[in-house]
Design a protein with these regions (language model features):
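A domain-start/cap signature at the N-terminus of enzymes
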Residues: 1-75, 151, 155-163
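N-terminal-biased segments
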Residues: 39-56, 114-128, 132
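Active-site-proximal beta-strand/loop segments in catalytic clefts of secreted hydrolases
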Residues: 66, 79-83, 109-112, 151-155, ...
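Gly/Ser-rich "nucleophile elbow"/oxyanion-hole loop immediately N-terminal to the catalytic nucleophile
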Residues: 68-72, 117-154, 170
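Loop/turn elements at helix/coil->beta-strand transitions in domains of secreted/extracellular proteins
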Residues: 72-76, 101-107, 144-148, 167-173
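Active-site machinery of serine-nucleophile hydrolases
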Residues: 74-76, 82-131
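Structured segments of extracytoplasmic/periplasmic soluble domains
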Residues: 101, 131-138, 163-166, 177
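Primarily recognizes the serine-hydrolase "nucleophile elbow" in alpha/beta-hydrolase
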Residues: 146-183
Length: 183
């Protein structure tokens, strides 16, 4: 069953596509052997660059998995300000130590060159949805469904707010520090 969810911003109605969470994963992945001394240790840790394709446009994002990430832990979707690469944000924002301290995975989205596109919010929602689906697919790690968090900074707050409103049943909490007035 396909469900469409809508958000009305300034009289423009935007939809979020099919919320089917099953992905057709085509990436070959080699999993290391489980550690019998520490079977809960994550297979993958550190930074993993990922890519999604929306309407033939490829966009990147980063996963950061802490060294002691639990079997099913929290995930924080971060929307930095305009024109900040996910790598720069991860290295300079102070979020890596927070992730290691709290054992929360970080999913760092990136604006396109020129910044987050408020005029075409649907393309940003589609990007966010693709990142969300790929992140929760349990390929590299497993997030607990009750602990998806969303944070937006600067102009990234606008996109984070729009996406979180469309997915209020999925996002446990949202924090915004920037321009997020959707009117």
């Amino acid at each position: 069953m396909k469900r469409e969810y809508c958000l009305d911003i300034d009289g423009n109605v935007y939809t979020i596509g099919d919320l089917n969470m099953f992905l057709d994963n085509k990436e070959p992945i080699s999993y290391p052997a489980a550690n019998p001394q520490d079977p809960a240790k994550p297979f993958f840790t550190g930074i993993i660059r990922q890519e999604v394709e929306i309407d033939s446009v490829k966009r990147s994002f980063l996963l950061y998995i802490p060294q002691h990430y639990p079997i099913s832990g929290a995930g924080i979707f971060l929307y930095p300000d305009d024109d900040i690469s996910a790598e720069d944000y991860l290295e300079n924002s102070g979020w890596k130590p927070v992730a290691e301290q709290t054992n929360a995975a970080l999913i760092v989205l990136e604006s396109r060159s020129g910044g987050w596109n408020k005029k075409d919010i649907q393309s940003e929602i589609s990007y966010s949805e693709a990142v969300f689906k790929k992140s929760i697919a349990r390929v590299y790690f497993s997030m607990n469904e009750a602990t998806y968090y969303c944070m937006g900074f600067g102009n990234g707050a606008y996109v984070a707010a729009a996406y979180a409103m469309l997915n209020s049943a999925l996002i446990a909490a949202v924090a915004l520090d920037g321009d997020y007035d959707l009117h």
